[in-house]
């Protein structure tokens, strides 16, 4: 139904309501009036006034304006900041009434209608109505993000406008959505209170930068008086205390009456008074009431106090408990139901289906349909051809039944066109893509995801009508370039829209669904199946035979073994051939390999073939090499095709990972004919009918004639380099079954519904634009899923070509039965996203970052972190009581930590140097870092590192005395045989250990550590410890060295030996607080690195400061250091938790700050982050890099260019291929090209200046590609398409794609010119668009027009 207009020209869309019946338009009869003149609307007649004189006017001005009076009920401090409702022109205000509408829209309810389950007991049923707040309708314009705002102009209904604000995204908390940033001084009302107390009048309102210019009124005295006029303001006060909520059918009655505006607050108070929550907490009401009533007049009634307190109590209670209770209830937003139970009771649960299907539904389809009937969002994960589209069709049917809209989004234009053709016969369908808009008023719209994103950002009114959004191929979110679009759309969709997500099987389906549910605050039902409708068999094709390696998802190692045996047998036979034949065979294989490698990259000098070369390959090169390639490729493919044909496994799709290689393989089969005479006739008739819409010259394009020749023989080619109409012909003929062999790139597997009997992989490696790599399991599964036609084949066959060798079993197993690629966030900030979000009050850029899939896990843990933060804040604070007065332990601890950082920087380099290694021998005195945060430890090296233990064994002196049970010797054969080591003999009979002496034995060989490390003990009144240390734990190397007995220390664990060693260490101390002199890292250890030398001197100075601190050497140093560390750790933990919960912890926050600075520098936003005219222009740029396009327009770089030249330069914004032949440009075009490139370099340098990871040269080369400037220039001048193809080596399909996208860029530049007010640029872009829109480039899609 078209738009219905009321008499006052108020735009209205039928889909705004949504109900189960239908609407009709009936005449609205008005009352007859006696006088024809009185039949005119009241607002036409001018109001009558008394005759005015100069004296009366002067008197009125003085009384009305020069002696202002403040009314307490109107200008109170509590109300002043909310609304200044002063009627400056009351004398001319007349009660106006709009003219009555000519017609009215009324709902018609017809049986049978659906009853909701909860209404069945009552017997009576009434349709649901939507309550609309008229205050939002009247005052909420396009600046509001709420739905009850006035609709915009009809021309902006579908696409929206850059002047509109996006609708409020779903999932935002109420407190956040309604929060507004108020300027300082507004909320307090202090300045108004000063005014009421006799202060001077304020001329600068809060947040305003300029004051009011009073002009000639400045000399007048500013005297204020307060009075009350109950007769004139009493009624207004009563009227303002009410609020009216009306139903849908009231919208077209007397909506503009004055009493509507004066009754906007009553229902809120009434609703608040009826809440049982307010009555349950009288204490809360009393306290809140006191707070609310502060500053009010004493004559406030008890009823008003109760109402206001009740409302506040409800809000307070919900704010405190609502979010926490909801969080406790919703641990996970993704749920999985019992599909079997729903399947058994499906027809009981859904007795009246919105659409009937001619086949029995699968269980997952029934579960999804049941969820859709209940208005729930669903995520369906299933293999290719499993029947996911059934769920999308049911969503379309529900939207049609509910008189709402459904949107189907697809990742690529090809899928959109095909779905449009598939759904046209079933539903009211429209199509919206970048260059096509067909039936946009339809209830079911098919569009690309970018179009939907643009609608959301531009606040299109059609968003109100949408009930369902279907996301097809959701796994496309992993795409690096365009995956961010899916996340943006999901985040920006309003609350009333439900989701239908269709995806291939991925490991983290629940994780992704949980993110969507948590973001939108709605439950997502996850369903699907891992069962394939047609089971697959995976085989290897080697030496003319097929070897089965996988069946029913079970990998078969026997097939690999048989293929390997065949390879060994073939290689052994090859060894026995004559040397001459062997050399020839080797040369042939090497040539084949080199040609295969060459197929992945197209040479710059290759030009398009002429019309005369139709029968030959369209790619030039060495004829001898091409001939060798054809013979080799033809023999391989003929073997496989004949094998598949004998086994009735045709048609087959051969996936190659190069456009060039697809063409060469097809051309190699010049003598192969796979079609019958009837099929040839069908192909010929179809091609003639499809290509008849082209001009004569376009019908004879080399690509068109070459493809027709291949198609007649049952061979097809499908890749991005083909013309769009040629690709569609190939797809349609393949679906008809007349193409037997199709060579295609992987784009054919992305959503195109064209299953085959067999799928062949030419290789398991591909070039992804950066490197050659193995196929991912998800990519293999997506392409292999095209094998097997549901309802026609019992099994599908997947074949991997093996030419020279059989792949490894591990590689095959990983690709065939490995886990699919997880869904991962590709979210990234763009300038256009930032500019759009800065225009939205309800959603900040930080909120968008928080709601991205990349931040999902961090945001999910926020409640736990918040609880932990509250616990840590509630812990009692520890204090250090120093016996020497004011505690200096904090400074000492900070110096210790800083010295530790310096030491870590240089210790690794110093200790790993050969000079340090030569000093770290047994007996060397060292100082070790303490792991407990106390004073450093003096030690001695007992043993160096070995092959089995890379640590140094060091004895260190510790002040603490360990428990005696730790002093133990490891269980080992402790021999008392003197020949095995040192033994102990007493000096005298007193038996004291200090009088024992050592006696060397004759044992030789390395020392074996038999004591258990760490080994503790006490000697000479101090504790010691023996354990292993890494070289990073050495603080310094001392210049002292002690003789030690390794055997007695490490093997025997002799106490006398340890006592003697400890005593020698203690003797080395000149006093109790200092260590022996250390080796100088610079002089002794030959430290030469300048940075490390500087670090060393900083470290020594810090140690000197530490020694001068009064805590150094304190008896309580260890205890206080532990306390200082705990206090520091507590503060650090608090700061870390606060940081993790803040916006600064977001992954892309640094990039966001840098981009904000760039936008400020350019002038897109001001210092207050308000979007300026440059920013509004940048918001229009979707096809090109927004900064370059915006700066280019404001520098007026197209002023001196003709439309043909301007559109040629603009092709650099949309062209994507990197390596092309260099174009030949005119001097004018070359100058414009250089100027645009310099602009990009300048912008790249600016972004690098603000710490963005951008290289200026790469930035310019990535966003500006001038390979088609010459081609587009000639095309705009009217040159035939066949001739412009000769100017470049870019495939015809990419040329068409670039020109089509260029037309969209012209429209964007036209909109930008309108914003700028540049009429000359607007006309130039219009002329440029008309110059390129012609012939084959803009030929209509066969899916849209039919054949």
From Swiss-Prot:
Name of the protein in question: DExH-box ATP-dependent RNA helicase DExH11
Main subcellular localisation: cytoplasm
Lineage: superkingdom: Eukaryota
Induction (free text): Induced by low potassium, zeatin and cold stress. Down-regulated by high potassium treatment.
Organism listed in the record: Arabidopsis thaliana
Coiled coil: none
Summary of subunit composition and partner proteins: Component of the cytoplasmic SKI complex, which consists of SKI2, SKI3 and VIP3/SKI8.
UniProt tissue specificity: Expressed in vascular tissues of leaves and roots of young plants.
Cellular component GO terms, alphabetical: cytoplasm; plant-type vacuole; Ski complex
Annotated InterPro entries: DEAD/DEAH_box_helicase_dom, Helicase_ATP-bd, Helicase_C-like, MTR4-like_stalk, MTR4_beta-barrel, P-loop_NTPase, RNA-DNA_Helicase, SKI2-like
């Amino acid at each position: 139904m078209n738009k219905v207009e009321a008499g006052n020209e108020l735009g209205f869309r039928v889909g705004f309501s949504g109900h189960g019946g239908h609407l009709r338009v009936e005449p609205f009869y008005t009352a007859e009036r006696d006088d024809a003149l009185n039949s005119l609307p009241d607002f036409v007649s001018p109001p009558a006034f008394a005759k005015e004189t100069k004296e009366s006017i002067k008197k009125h001005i003085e009384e009305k304006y020069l002696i202002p009076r403040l009314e307490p009920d109107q200008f109170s401090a509590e109300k002043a900041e909310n609304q200044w409702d002063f009627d400056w022109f009351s004398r001319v205000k007349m009660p106006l009434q709009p003219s009555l509408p000519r017609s009215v829209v009324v709902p018609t309810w017809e049986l049978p209608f659906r009853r909701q389950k909860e209404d069945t007991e009552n017997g009576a049923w009434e349709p649901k109505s939507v309550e609309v707040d008229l205050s939002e309708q009247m005052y909420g314009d396009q600046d509001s993000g709420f739905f009850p705002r006035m609709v915009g102009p009809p021309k902006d209904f579908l696409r929206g406008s850059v002047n509109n604000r996006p609708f409020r995204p779903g999932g935002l908390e109420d407190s956040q959505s309604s929060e507004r940033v108020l300027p300082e001084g507004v909320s307090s009302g202090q300045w108004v209170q000063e005014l009421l107390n006799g202060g001077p009048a304020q001329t600068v309102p809060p947040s305003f930068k300029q004051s009011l210019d009073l002009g000639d009124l400045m000399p007048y005295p500013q005297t204020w008086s307060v009075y009350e006029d109950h007769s004139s303001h009493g009624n207004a006060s009563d009227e303002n205390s009410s609020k009216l909520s009306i139903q849908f059918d009231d919208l077209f009655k007397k909506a503009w009456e004055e009493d509507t505006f004066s009754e906007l607050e009553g229902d809120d108070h009434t609703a608040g008074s009826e809440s049982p929550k307010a009555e349950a907490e009288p204490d809360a009401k009393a306290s809140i009431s006191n707070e609310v009533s502060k500053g009010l007049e004493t004559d406030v009634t008890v009823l008003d106090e109760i109402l206001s307190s009740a409302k506040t109590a409800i809000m307070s209670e919900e704010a405190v408990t609502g979010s926490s209770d909801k969080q406790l209830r919703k641990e996970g937003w993704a749920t999985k139901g019992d599909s079997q139970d729903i399947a058994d009771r499906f027809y009981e649960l859904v007795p009246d289906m919105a659409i009937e299907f001619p086949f029995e539904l699968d269980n997952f389809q029934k579960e999804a349909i049941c969820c859709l009937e209940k208005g729930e969002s669903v995520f369906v994960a299933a293999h290719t051809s499993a029947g996911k589209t059934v769920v999308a069709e049911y969503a379309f049917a529900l939207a049609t039944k509910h008189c709402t809209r459904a949107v189907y989004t697809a990742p690529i234009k090809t899928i959109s066109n095909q779905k449009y053709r598939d759904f046209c016969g079933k539903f009211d369908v429209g199509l919206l893509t970048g260059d096509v808009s067909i039936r946009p008023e339809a209830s079911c719209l098919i569009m690309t995801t970018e179009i939907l994103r643009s609608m959301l950002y531009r606040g299109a009114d059609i968003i109100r009508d949408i009930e369902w959004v279907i996301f097809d191929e959701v796994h496309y979110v992993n795409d690096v370039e365009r995956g961010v679009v899916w996340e943006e759309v999901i985040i920006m969709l309003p609350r009333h829209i439900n989701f239908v997500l269709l995806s291939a099987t991925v490991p983290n389906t629940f994780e992704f669904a949980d993110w969507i549910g948590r973001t939108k605050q709605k439950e997502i039902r996850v369903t699907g199946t891992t069962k394939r409708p047609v089971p697959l068999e995976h085989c290897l094709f080697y030496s003319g035979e097929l070897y089965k390696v996988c069946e029913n998802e079970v990998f078969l190692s026997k097939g690999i073994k048989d293929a390997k045996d065949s390879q060994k047998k073939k290689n052994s036979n090859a060894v026995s051939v004559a040397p001459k034949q062997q050399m020839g065979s080797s040369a042939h294989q090497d040539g084949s390999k080199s040609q295969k490698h060459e197929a992945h990259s197209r040479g710059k000098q290759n030009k398009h073939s002429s019309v005369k070369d139709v029968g030959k390959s369209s790619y030039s090169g060495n004829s001898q090499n091409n001939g060798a390639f054809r013979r080799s490729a033809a023999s391989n493919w003929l073997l496989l095709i004949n094998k598949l044909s004998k086994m009735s496994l045709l048609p087959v799709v051969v996936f190659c990972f190069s456009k060039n290689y697809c063409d060469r393989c097809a051309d190699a089969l010049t003598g192969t004919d796979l079609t019958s005479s009837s099929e040839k006739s069908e192909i010929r008739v179809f091609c003639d009918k499809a290509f008849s819409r082209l001009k004569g010259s376009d019908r004879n394009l080399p690509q068109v004639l070459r493809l027709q020749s291949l198609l007649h023989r049952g061979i097809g080619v499908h890749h991005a380099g083909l013309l769009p109409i040629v690709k569609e012909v190939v797809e349609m003929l393949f679906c008809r079954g007349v193409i037997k062999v199709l060579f295609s790139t992987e784009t054919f597997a992305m959503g195109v519904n064209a299953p085959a009997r067999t799928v062949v992989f030419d290789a398991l490696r591909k070039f992804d634009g950066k490197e050659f790599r193995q196929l991912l399991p998800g990519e293999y599964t997506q392409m292999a899923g095209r094998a097997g036609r549901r309802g026609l084949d019992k099994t599908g066959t997947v074949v991997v070509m093996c030419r020279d060798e059989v792949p490894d079993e591990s590689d095959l197993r990983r690709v065939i039965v490995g886990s699919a690629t997880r869904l991962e966030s590709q979210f990234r900030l763009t300038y256009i996203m930032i500019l759009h979000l800065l225009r939205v009050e309800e959603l900040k850029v930080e909120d968008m970052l928080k709601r991205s899939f990349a931040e999902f896990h961090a945001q999910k843990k926020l409640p736990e972190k918040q609880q932990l933060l509250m616990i840590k804040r509630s812990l009692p604070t520890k204090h250090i009581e120093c016996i020497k007065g004011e505690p200096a332990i904090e400074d000492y601890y900070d110096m210790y930590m800083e010295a530790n950082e310096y030491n870590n920087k240089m210790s690794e380099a110093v200790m790993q140097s050969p000079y340090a290694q030569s000093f770290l021998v047994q007996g060397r005195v060292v100082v070790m870092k303490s792991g407990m945060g106390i004073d450093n430890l003096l030690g001695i090296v007992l043993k160096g590192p070995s092959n089995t233990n890379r640590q140094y064994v060091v004895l260190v002196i510790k002040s603490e005395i360990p428990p005696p049970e730790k002093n133990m010797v490891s269980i080992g054969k402790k021999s008392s045989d003197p020949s095995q080591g040192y033994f102990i003999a007493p000096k005298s009979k007193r038996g004291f250990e200090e009088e024992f002496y050592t006696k060397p034995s004759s044992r030789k060989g390395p020392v074996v550590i038999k004591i258990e490390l760490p080994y503790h003990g006490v000697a000479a009144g101090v504790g010691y410890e023996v354990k292993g240390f890494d070289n990073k734990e050495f603080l310094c190397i001392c210049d002292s060295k002690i003789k030690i007995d390794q055997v007695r220390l490490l093997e025997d664990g002799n106490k006398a030996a340890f006592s003697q060693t400890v005593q020698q260490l203690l003797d080395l101390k000149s006093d109790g607080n200092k260590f022996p002199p250390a080796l100088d890292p610079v002089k002794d250890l030959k430290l030469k690195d300048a940075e490390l030398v500087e670090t060393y001197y900083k470290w020594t100075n810090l140690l000197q400061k530490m020694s001068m601190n009064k805590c150094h050497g304190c008896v309580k140093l260890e205890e206080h250091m532990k306390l200082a560390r705990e206090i520091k750790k507590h503060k650090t933990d608090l700061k870390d938790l606060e940081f993790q919960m803040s916006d600064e912890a977001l992954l892309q926050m640094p990039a966001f700050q840098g981009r904000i600075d760039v936008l400020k520098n350019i002038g897109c936003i001001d210092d207050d982050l308000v979007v300026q005219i440059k920013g509004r222009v940048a918001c229009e740029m979707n096809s090109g890099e927004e900064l370059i396009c915006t700066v280019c327009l404001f520098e007026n770089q197209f002023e001196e260019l003709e439309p043909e030249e301007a559109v040629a330069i603009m092709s650099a914004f949309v062209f994507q291929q990197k390596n092309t032949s260099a174009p030949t440009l005119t001097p004018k075009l070359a100058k414009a090209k250089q100027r645009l490139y310099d602009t990009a370099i300048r912008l790249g340098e600016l972004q690098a200046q603000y710490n963005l990871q951008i290289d200026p040269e790469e930035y310019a080369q990535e966003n500006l590609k001038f390979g088609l400037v010459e081609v587009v220039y000639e095309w705009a001048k009217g040159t035939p398409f066949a001739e412009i193809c000769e100017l470049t080596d870019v495939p015809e399909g990419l040329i068409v794609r670039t020109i089509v996208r260029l037309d969209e860029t012209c429209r964007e530049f036209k909109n930008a010119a309108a914003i700028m007010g540049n009429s000359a640029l607007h006309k130039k872009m219009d002329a440029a668009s008309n110059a390129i829109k012609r012939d084959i480039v803009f030929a209509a899609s066969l899916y849209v027009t039919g054949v």
